[in-house]
Design a protein with these regions (language model features):
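Non-heme di-metal
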Residues: 9-10, 18-22, 26, 242-244, ...
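Single, function-defining residue in the core of a domain
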Residues: 42-44, 58-62, 96-391
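Short, basic interhelical loop/turn and adjoining N-cap
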Residues: 2-15
Length: 391
């Protein structure tokens, strides 16, 4: 027991050292570059950058930067928790599976929100950090919920020609018709048309698409300056149903080639009248980040850290994330593990750990035999067994 305690203490002391923090930072950079290498073979496909944040509850008070946080998704009787908030960016990369394009979700990293800058500014800086990894011809789309669909993050789209944004927005966001054509009369031309309402100015589809009626309209909104964008409104019922608003800086006609080889409906229905709703359907990739949070928190011990400093916590959380993503990337990087592409990350981790454990056991066993027992027959048999394990 004392040996185990010493090992745990050594692990956490190591995370506080600057040398280890620098090495961990290099590991994170290598992981990010490897993630982007996976998408170069499908460079004509769109890549998604999902932005969100998650909270980790901590009962102790000695953790650096621990504070009271509002949790809108809490179901324990209180909307507040004591803990840390992490902003995360997830990369959804296209991969071939069963002669179709499927998307693999890889969280790129976590940054702790320390309240020195807003979560919007933190997310924008993380996106600026990864954008140079994209080739100029590689299209990227930011996916985010209504908390992040604001001007701080929306303005970053204008900084890169190959970057767009699809996001849920506040239902009371101000929208206008596009500016009318110039009449030739004297005076300054109008910047926009009349103000639009989600209640009266969106014509809904005749039938439900999935669980919702959908209305589409080209609009101008202050969130994206004078840029014309596509707006969508979804409703459970045409008259009195709950409505949600979405904005997209990319238009359906720009996604025609992307949809042709998609694995799932309705993304592959390019010839139907649903094509105009494709940007809205793409928002479904945003839910992959919630699945990632659930897996990392419940199975990969993302919330179990005992490091006290902010830097140490960030390093540990990101190292756990790298281990998680390595299990996702490896079946696509090494054909030897290709059978695990359709299996869960946890199942692949178990199988891989079993193989590593058996090889370590056999190697140590052979080393001890060579030291203490001089039996050529046993040594040859065990070496042959090790070769079979490797190949």
């Amino acid at each position: 027991m004392l040996v185990l305690i010493k090992r745990v203490k050594t692990k956490y002391l190591l995370l506080e050292q600057k040398k280890f923090q620098n090495k961990s930072k290099n590991i994170c950079e290598v992981y990010q570059s490897e993630s982007f290498r996976c998408i170069m073979s499908l460079s004509y496909r769109i890549t998604f950058l999902c932005v969100d944040d998650t909270m980790v509850a901590k009962t102790g008070t000695r953790f650096e930067n621990v504070s009271k946080l509002f949790d809108h998704a809490a179901h324990n009787g209180s909307n507040y928790l004591n803990g840390h908030c992490f902003v995360n960016i997830m990369l959804c990369i296209p991969v071939w599976k069963n002669d179709r394009v499927s998307y693999l979700s890889l969280p790129l990293g976590y940054r702790m929100w320390q309240k020195k800058e807003s979560k919007l500014e933190l997310a924008a800086s993380m996106i600026r950090q990864v954008m140079p990894e994209f080739q100029e011809k590689k299209q990227a789309i930011i996916l985010c919920d209504s908390w992040y669909t604001k001007q701080n993050l929306g303005s970053i789209v204008d900084e890169y020609q190959n970057l767009d944004l699809i996001g849920n927005a506040r239902i009371d966001s101000v929208m206008y018709d596009p500016a009318p054509a110039h009449t030739g009369r004297r005076g300054r031309p109008a910047k926009h048309g009349k103000r639009l309402s989600v209640e009266t100015d969106f014509a809904f589809s005749n039938e439900k698409i999935g669980d919702y009626y959908i209305g589409a309209h080209r609009v101008i909104t202050n969130l994206f300056g004078c840029r014309e964008i596509q707006a969508y409104v979804t409703a459970t019922e045409k008259e009195h149903g709950t409505k949600r608003l979405f904005f997209s800086t990319i238009f359906p006609e720009d996604l025609q080639i992307f949809c042709a080889c998609q694995e799932k409906e309705p993304l592959n229905q390019t010839g139907s009248d649903r094509m105009k709703y494709i940007p809205l359907f793409l928002y479904s990739f945003q839910w992959n980040i919630e699945t990632s949070y659930y897996e990392q928190k419940t199975i990969w011990s993302l919330c179990s850290y005992m490091v006290r400093s902010c830097k140490g916590i960030e390093m540990l959380v990101n190292l756990i994330n790298i281990c998680y993503c390595a299990m996702k990337i490896l079946p696509y990087q090494d054909e030897q593990f290709s059978e695990y592409r359709t299996k869960s990350v946890q199942e692949f981790r178990f199988e891989l750990s079993q193989g590593i454990r058996s090889q370590i056991f056999l190697t140590n066993f052979v080393r001890n035999i060579e030291t203490h027992i001089k039996s050529n027959v046993i040594i040859k048999a065990l070496k042959q067994l090790i070769r079979q394990q490797v190949y």
